Amino acid sequence: MGHNGNSYYIGIDLNDSYAMVSFFQQNMKEPETVSTVAGSEEFQIPLVLARRKSIGKWYYGDEARRLSKSGEMVCIDRLLKRALNSEKIVIDDDSFMAEELLALFLKKVMELPSKLGNPSSFDRLVICVDRLTKENVSMFYGMAVRLGINSRQLTVIDRKESFYYFALNQDKSLWLHDVVMFMQEKESIFFYSLKRDLRTTPQVVSIDESISYTLDKNDKDKSFLDIINESFKNQIISTVFLVGDTFAEGWMKQSVALLCKGRRVFMGNNLFTKGACYAAATRDREAEWPFVYMGENEMKFNLSLKVHDKGELSFYNLISAGSNWFESKGQCEVIISGSYEVDFWKQLPKSREAKIETLRLTDMPPRPDRATRIRITATPVSDDRIDIEIKDLGFGEIFMSSGKVWHYEMTM
């Protein structure tokens, strides 16, 4: 599918208990979240699979949970944790890897929007999880083929990044100042504050996360009021988002009055699945996006080479600040002119100045000028460290490669 008004995106919010799925097209006002029950506002799909013992048919979600109460079904839950632990699950005489079953569950969830008459294929799938690790990112990308897509169609983000995409895809009046979110997770309340640096182009966006708070069960309203007062110190806030079942229980009186004082307040549990859809759509039009997100998983500096291309001097960007270091990789082939040295340009997104770091290719066999081609590969190993590999490719059949490879770890 092309990246036009008909481009189609899927966003899944996933944890070890449930999934939520939304879909989005550029001609829609906002993403739409899908329920397994037509007309229902119950969007959480339990992360459960069940299989009938006598036959190989699989059920998922609420239906799997309901059917598992009969003795004819085998029920499997906590699939995300089991998949990350590479568990093997045995049912009757069959054995399955948990990752395989998680992919089966996700495939069924991904098919839900198509049952509403939407396309069966899509441009991009974004999966949102609580936190990113090298292990879960690697697992999801390894799962792409089972999901019927290629890895270029898949993106994995965490909840903070989903909040970033959700908030900044709203009407501009909602993010004139800071945007904040209170999120309930079991007994804890977490506070997130999104700030934009107006001095930079593009604007650098950061999200601060507070320590967790606990509501006093005897007086939730007063307890939340205290949390709000503590969290809102020294901030001008345009909009507040409330995510979690507890906020819909009807106990907010004084606290909601304070929240709404000069601010817009929204409540709902499907923010992260909608944010995942916005992430998918935004990444297909990144050139128009006036922000760069600097979270804990995002690269902290730009890494470039200065090259001559068709007679013009230009910068070739290997790694971009704000790109997720789990996913980023840069590679190019260049012909060396002059000495056997490569200059790397390092720049912070908030700075106009660049640092130049020169790597000398020691023990390179002598050749005429412009008769050596090298391949440069830049692979981040964290959000502020990049492994540089430079490989001598020789020069066609005239000068064979020496086979030499140079490694260096680069920091800002």
Which residue stretches match the model-derived regions?
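Conserved phosphate-binding catalytic cores of ATP/NTP-utilizing and phosphoryl-transfer enzymes
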Residues: 1-10, 150-180, 271-292, 367-368
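Early-domain small/polar-rich strand-loop-helix modules and first-structured segments
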Residues: 1-88, 155, 361, 366-412
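A short acidic Gly-Thr/Ser loop motif
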Residues: 5, 11-18, 173-190, 195-196, ...
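Glycine-rich phosphate-binding loop plus the immediately following alpha-helix
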Residues: 19, 44-54, 68-73, 196-228, ...
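Conserved phosphate-binding loops in N-terminal lobes of ATP-dependent enzymes
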Residues: 35-128, 211-225
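Glycine-rich phosphate-binding loops at beta-strand->alpha-helix junctions
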Residues: 126-137, 230-256
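Small-residue (GG/TT-enriched) beta-loop-alpha framework at ligand/catalytic clefts
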Residues: 127, 135, 142-224
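Acidic low-complexity intrinsically disordered segments
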Residues: 288-412
